[in-house]
């Protein structure tokens, strides 16, 4: 530790370092060693929930707990404290005549934030709070910095996101939200594993961005002297596994898109993609509904859920509507009759729909109408299907109307939660779509993809009819934790330095 760093320490930090050195002089490792505990705070509260003070005294049972010291009060020969572990807090009752002079000195000199282990009798105070009456204290780790003021929770947003460790210590609501996230992902895995899907891993570094309409992050591989991109989707590699005969696969992993940031977008996020051979988009629609309803039930229980004051009937069958019908219902404009691109553009101008240079087909205009007018109306879980071919380069054409694809998106509270389709398995058609995307890219569409010749070659070996799905894990977690910003469900969101 440099002298410069010591000079920057405040008074509290200096005192804590002095206490650290005093512990070492007493032969106590300031940063401790392994410690065996017999219970956590939640287990004790559950086990003894119905026991009175007198009944606990009669039982005379002991427990060994460990955690971070969050409060401490008292004077003379008696003190109280609260110890925090992963499940919550438990009160400590510490008497000098019960723990001995040396142990009581450890307690007296302990700072808030220190980790200690405590062995003692399970009791209930006169106020009715379940507590541990300590008989032995063990110092486990020294905190050299004071915790956030009064531990009532951080309120500075920058600190919450940059120093998530402090947020987790001081904000139980935040801590529980991330526990819910982990449980949600585990339940999705459990659901798919139960349907005989295999979890796999595919590369994060790609030679060509593909599988989604998004701008990639570019990096350089020094050893091979080639530029590479971080994946914007896992789709193309997973479909190569379907070609290889794996039949049912999924991957939960990080995706990287070099795009804007807002309440629902972070450049680095988590998605799940699922592929099932011999299935179509209708099968995947049912699968999607099952995944989301299973996850919701596991973390929220049966029934509808509340999201920002709106009751979401996530437990009921999801609505299903064709994109063209949804547009007609909201705007009165009917795109079912055949029309020229000029006629479609005229309709767009009439309705003041923003137009982009790469909107060169009726399909682009239909999609623009949907995004402009319909998305904001989709509050209850709704599957919108039948996207135009032009905006669905990896989806199979609908055999009854080849202007559209066998694709759907799931919308809840006006946001997209899933994207899925009957996968395009015709390599000739796939190459043609890739070429159209490459042309759109030249016209200024930054989200258009290039041509992945390796994937086209894989398709030429034959891929069975397949349904595929992508779900945004972070958005789903936002929904199930009643959160309005993606940063609150990412442990470490992207921040400026």
Curated annotation (Swiss-Prot):
Cofactor(s) in the UniProt record: Mg(2+)
Record's catalysed reaction(s): tRNA(Lys) + L-lysine + ATP = L-lysyl-tRNA(Lys) + AMP + diphosphate
PROSITE patterns: AA_TRNA_LIGASE_II (PS50862)
Binding positions for Mg(2+) 2 per the UniProt entry: 416
Disulfide bonds: none
Ranges in a coiled coil: none
Principal location listed in the UniProt entry: cytoplasm
GO cellular component, one term: cytosol
Sorted UniProt keywords: Aminoacyl-tRNA synthetase, ATP-binding, Cytoplasm, Ligase, Magnesium, Metal-binding, Nucleotide-binding, Protein biosynthesis
Sample GO molecular function, one term: catalytic activity, acting on a protein
Subcellular location: Cytoplasm
Cofactor details (free text): Binds 3 Mg(2+) ions per subunit.
InterPro entries: Aa-tRNA-synt_II, aa-tRNA-synth_II, aa-tRNA-synth_II/BPL/LPL, Lys-tRNA-ligase_II, Lys-tRNA-ligase_II_N, Lys-tRNA-synth_II_C, NA-bd_OB-fold, NA-bd_OB_tRNA
Binding site for Mg(2+) 1: 409, 416
An annotated GO BP: lysyl-tRNA aminoacylation
EC number(s) reported in the record: 6.1.1.6
Domain of life of the native organism: Bacteria
Subunit structure: Homodimer.
Family that this chain belongs to: Belongs to the class-II aminoacyl-tRNA synthetase family.
Name of the protein: Lysine--tRNA ligase
UniProt source species: Streptococcus pyogenes serotype M49 (strain NZ131)
The encoding gene: lysS
């Amino acid at each position: 530790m440099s002298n410069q760093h010591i000079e920057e320490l405040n008074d509290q930090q200096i005192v804590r370092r002095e206490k650290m050195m005093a512990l070492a002089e007493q032969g106590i490792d300031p940063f401790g060693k392994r410690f065996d505990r017999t219970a956590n705070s939640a287990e004790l509260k559950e086990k003894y929930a119905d026991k009175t003070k007198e009944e606990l005294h009669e039982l005379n049972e002991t427990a060994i707990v460990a955690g971070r010291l969050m409060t401490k009060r008292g004077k003379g020969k008696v003190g109280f404290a609260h110890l925090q572990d992963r499940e919550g807090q438990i009160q400590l009752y510490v008497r000098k005549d019960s723990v001995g002079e040396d142990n009581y000195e450890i307690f007296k000199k302990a700072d808030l934030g220190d980790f200690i282990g405590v062995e003692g009798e399970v009791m209930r105070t006169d106020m009715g709070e379940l507590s541990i009456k300590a008989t032995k204290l063990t110092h486990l780790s020294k905190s050299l910095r004071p915790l956030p003021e009064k531990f009532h929770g951080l309120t500075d947003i920058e600190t919450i996101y940059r120093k998530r460790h402090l947020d987790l210590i001081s904000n139980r609501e935040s801590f529980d939200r991330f526990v819910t996230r982990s449980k949600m992902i585990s339940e999705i895995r459990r659901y798919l594993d139960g349907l005989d899907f295999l979890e796999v891993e595919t590369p994060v570094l790609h030679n060509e961005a593909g599988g989604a309409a998004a701008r990639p992050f570019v990096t350089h591989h020094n050893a091979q002297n080639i530029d590479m991109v971080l994946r914007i989707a896992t789709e193309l590699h997973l479909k190569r596994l379907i070609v290889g005969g794996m039949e049912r696969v999924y991957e939960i992993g990080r995706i990287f898109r070099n795009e804007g940031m807002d309440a629902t977008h972070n450049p680095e996020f988590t998605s799940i993609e699922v592929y099932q051979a011999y299935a179509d988009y209708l099968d995947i629609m049912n699968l999607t509904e099952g995944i989301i309803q299973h996850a919701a039930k596991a973390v929220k229980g049966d029934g509808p859920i509340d999201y920002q004051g709106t009751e979401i009937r996530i437990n009921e069958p999801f609505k299903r509507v064709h994109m063209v019908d949804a547009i007609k219902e909201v705007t009165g404009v009917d795109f079912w009759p055949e029309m020229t691109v000029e006629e479609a553009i005229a309709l767009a101008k009439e309705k003041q729909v923003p137009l982009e240079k790469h909107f060169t087909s009726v399909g682009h205009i239909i999609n623009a109408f949907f995004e402009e007018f319909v998305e904001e109306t989709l509050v209850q879980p709704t599957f919108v299907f039948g996207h135009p071919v032009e905006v669905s380069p990896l989806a199979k054409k609908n055999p009854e109307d080849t202007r559209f694809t066998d694709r759907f998106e799931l919308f809840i509270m006006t946001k997209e939660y899933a994207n899925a389709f009957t996968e395009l398995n015709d390599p000739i058609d796939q190459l043609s779509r890739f070429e159209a995307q490459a042309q759109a890219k030249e016209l200024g569409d930054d989200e258009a993809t290039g041509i992945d010749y390796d994937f086209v070659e894989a398709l030429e070996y034959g891929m069975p009819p397949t349904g595929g799905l992508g779900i945004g894990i972070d958005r789903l977690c936002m929904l199930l934790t009643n959160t309005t910003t993606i940063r609150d469900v990412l442990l470490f969101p992207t921040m400026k330095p």
